[in-house]
């Protein structure tokens, strides 16, 4: 049995991209974001690639999509010596990731629409042993005084009431239960389009409306949408796995690779007829 000797923070996504090497990139399936980076740890393999419909890969719209694959070894530290503090690294055995980071944004009092389409590979396997897989998150920028939360919201594959679901979760709209997007087994091998319409507020005057395949599945009104005192953030898309320590301490080689496809990743302002009425 292997023993995990380093201290791991209980906060899921506290690892900030500044501790990793970030490589500029440009995917044409991402629109509206000013910056794109592959969030890549030092000396790790990039498994995020553009694939073509003409080569037989699943594509939601147009000719290409983004294939994301994560391996159990996709963890580590950035340049320098951040490994002295485990909080600054992805702890091997407890986390692995392949993500695209889309640049910091001011959020407070803004009204934004975030869209993306996700396709779970037919061979995608959900994790066991209490592990969680995040596919899409709005990370907090941690710049404001009192901003200690990792994220404003995220979408994850996790076990819920005995089965694995893709769910939306928020640390901001703190009174809300997870929003069920779909059972993982039902989402494999097909595209699911998601749209998040958000009025970013630090008090309980915000709103968060969620669409799945153009149908409203949740609408949180008069709610806090910014975590803690946080006023900014940045979207990350890809696969981020945490709490995989159960595999490390038992059968590390049984932790499977996972693959999803992403397309039509869009940030935009709402059109005049889409804006929330005051």
Residue map of PLM features:
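Positively charged n-region of N-terminal signal peptides that target proteins for export
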Residues: 1-4
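Bacterial N-terminal signal peptides
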Residues: 6-14
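Low-complexity, Ser/Thr/Pro/Gly-rich disordered linker/stalk regions
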Residues: 20-278
């Amino acid at each position: 049995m292997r023993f995990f000797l380093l201290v791991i923070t209980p906060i899921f996504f506290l690892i900030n991209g500044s501790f990793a090497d970030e490589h500029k990139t440009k995917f044409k399936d991402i629109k509206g974001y000013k910056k794109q980076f592959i969030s890549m740890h030092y000396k790790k393999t990039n498994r995020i690639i553009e694939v073509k419909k003409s080569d037989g890969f699943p594509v939601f719209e147009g000719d290409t999509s983004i294939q994301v694959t994560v391996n159990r070894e996709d963890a580590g530290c950035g340049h320098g010596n951040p490994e002295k503090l485990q909080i600054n690294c992805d702890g091997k055995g407890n986390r692995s990731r392949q993500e695209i980071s889309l640049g910091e944004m001011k959020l407070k009092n803004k009204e934004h629409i975030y869209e993306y389409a996700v396709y779970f590979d037919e061979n995608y396997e959900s994790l066991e042993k209490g592990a969680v897989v995040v596919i899409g998150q709005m990370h907090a920028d941690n710049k404001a005084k009192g901003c200690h939360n990792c994220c404003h919201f995220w979408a994850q594959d996790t076990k819920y009431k005995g089965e694995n679901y893709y769910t939306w979760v928020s640390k901001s709209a703190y009174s809300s239960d997870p929003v069920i997007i779909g059972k993982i087994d039902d989402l494999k091998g097909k595209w699911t389009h998601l749209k998040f319409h958000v009025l970013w507020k630090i008090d309980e005057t915000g709103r968060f409306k969620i669409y799945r395949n153009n149908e409203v599945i949740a609408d949180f009104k008069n709610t806090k949408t910014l975590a803690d005192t946080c006023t900014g953030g940045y979207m990350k898309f890809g696969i981020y796995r945490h709490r995989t320590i159960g595999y490390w301490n038992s059968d590390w080689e049984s932790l499977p690779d996972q693959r999803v496809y992403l397309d039509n990743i869009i940030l935009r302002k709402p059109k005049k007829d889409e804006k929330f009425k005051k």
